[in-house]
């Protein structure tokens, strides 16, 4: 991929472990500008999903990159393509059976009688941060052809495992 030297290229990936009751989620970024890696970041938390973590990290990145910039998020997670779409009543209250992004989450939420959320709180913050910039977009890339994307997933998975381990050590 040919890069424009004025654009910030933000490789972003996430990971979530639906198999644990404390369900850790994580996200990581590698930021390129002027053909150089200028920053790496990773976040994780318990009782969340990789999608919430990815949106949270997108907000942080858009806040930290200088105002008026061009930003392109590169990912294999189609979910975040809607980071700048105003939440509707339907998307904010999507039933778990309508969730197309995480069938495991849908099954899990459905079995507990809850609705899967479309993260309207984070989408609104993304929209606000996007307004500070000249342009912000998302490009879907192939995972196996993108070493920096693979790195983000690995770092998110490591952070998630560390968060879970610290939780269990603290609660022994």
Language model segments and positions:
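Loop-to-helix element that buttresses phosphate recognition and phosphoryl-transfer chemistry
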Residues: 53, 57
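Short, surface-exposed, polar/charged, turn-prone segments marking secondary-structure boundaries
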Residues: 36-40, 58-59, 101-102, 124-127, ...
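Charged phosphate-binding loop/patch that engages nucleotide di/tri-phosphates or the phosphate backbone
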Residues: 150-172
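RNase H-like nuclease fold core
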Residues: 1-52, 63-64, 162-164
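Alpha-helix boundary/interfacial micro-motifs
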Residues: 30-31, 93-95, 168-170
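Intrinsic disorder/low-structure terminal segments
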Residues: 7-8, 72, 142, 166
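RNase H catalytic domain
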Residues: 15-21, 59-153
């Amino acid at each position: 991929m040919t890069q424009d030297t004025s654009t910030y290229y933000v490789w972003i990936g996430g990971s979530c472990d639906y198999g644990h009751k404390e369900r850790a989620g994580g996200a990581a970024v590698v930021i390129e500008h002027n053909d150089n890696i200028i920053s790496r970041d990773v976040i994780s938390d318990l009782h969340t999903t990789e999608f919430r973590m990815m949106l949270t990290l997108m907000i942080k990145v858009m806040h930290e990159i200088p105002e008026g910039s061009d930003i392109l998020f590169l990912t294999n997670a189609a979910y975040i393509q809607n980071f700048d779409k105003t939440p509707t009543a339907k998307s904010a209250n999507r039933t778990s059976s309508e969730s197309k992004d995480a069938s495991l989450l849908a099954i899990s939420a459905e079995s507990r009688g809850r609705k899967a959320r479309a993260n309207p709180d984070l989408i609104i913050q993304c929209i606000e941060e996007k307004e500070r910039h000249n342009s912000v977009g998302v490009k879907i890339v192939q995972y196996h052809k993108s070493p920096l994307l693979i790195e983000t997933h690995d770092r998110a998975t490591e952070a998630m495992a560390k968060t879970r381990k610290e939780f269990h050590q603290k609660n022994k």
